[in-house]
C-alpha cells in the first residue's frame, strides 16, 4: 500500500490573528484602514453546543452595498449553569437563548471564514481553502485571462475589509480575546 503524506498546513485551520496579520502586512492596500468605514449592521450567533462550535453571521455594509460575512469557530467551551461564568463571554441566538462560553482566543483559536464580496473571493478564498480556513465550498478554479500580475502573489490566506470589521467588532464585544 502506498503511503500518502499531507502537509500539516492542510490539516488545520488558521487562527484569526494570523489571517488578520497576513492581510495587514502582506498587501499594499490599507484594508485595515478601510475596514473602519465598514458598518457591521447585524450580527447573528448560531450556537451548536453539542458540537462545541459557534457560527457568527453578519451583514456588513460598505459603499452602499451589503455583504454576508461569516466566521465559524470550533472547539468552543460552553459553560453550564454550575460553571464559573465570571470570566465568560455570552451571546444570544435569534430565538432569544443566551449562551455562556469561555472567551474565544484571538491568537489561538482556529477559524473558518467567508464573505460574499469579490475581494475575498478573488484574493483570498482559494488560499483560505488550501489552509482549511475557508467556510463552505471552495471557489471554482480561476482561469487567468489577462497578463496582469496576480492579485495575491504570496498566495496567503487572509481577510477582506468586511471580515476585518467583523473581527474588530467581536474583539470590542470581548467575544474574541
Feature annotation, model-predicted:
Residues 1-177:
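Long, low-complexity, compositionally biased intrinsically disordered regions
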Amino acid at each position: 500500500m502506498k503511503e500518502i503524506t499531507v502537509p500539516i498546513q492542510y490539516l488545520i485551520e488558521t487562527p484569526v490573528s494570523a489571517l488578520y496579520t497576513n492581510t495587514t502586512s502582506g498587501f499594499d492596500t490599507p484594508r485595515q484602514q478601510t475596514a473602519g468605514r465598514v458598518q457591521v449592521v447585524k450580527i447573528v450567533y448560531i450556537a451548536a453546543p453539542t458540537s462545541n462550535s459557534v457560527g457568527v453571521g453578519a451583514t456588513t455594509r460598505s459603499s452602499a452595498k451589503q455583504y454576508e460575512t461569516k466566521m465559524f469557530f470550533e472547539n468552543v467551551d460552553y459553560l453550564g449553569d454550575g460553571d464559573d461564568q465570571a470570566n465568560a463571554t455570552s451571546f444570544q441566538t435569534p430565538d432569544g437563548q443566551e449562551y455562556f462560553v469561555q472567551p474565544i482566543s484571538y491568537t489561538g483559536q482556529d477559524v473558518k471564514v467567508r464573505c460574499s464580496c469579490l475581494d475575498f473571493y478573488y484574493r483570498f478564498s482559494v488560499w483560505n481553502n488550501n489552509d482549511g480556513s475557508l467556510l463552505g465550498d471552495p471557489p471554482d478554479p480561476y482561469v487567468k485571462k489577462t497578463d496582469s500580475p496576480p492579485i495575491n502573489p504570496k498566495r496567503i490566506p487572509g481577510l477582506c475589509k468586511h471580515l476585518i470589521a467583523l473581527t474588530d467588532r467581536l474583539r470590542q464585544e470581548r467575544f474574541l480575546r
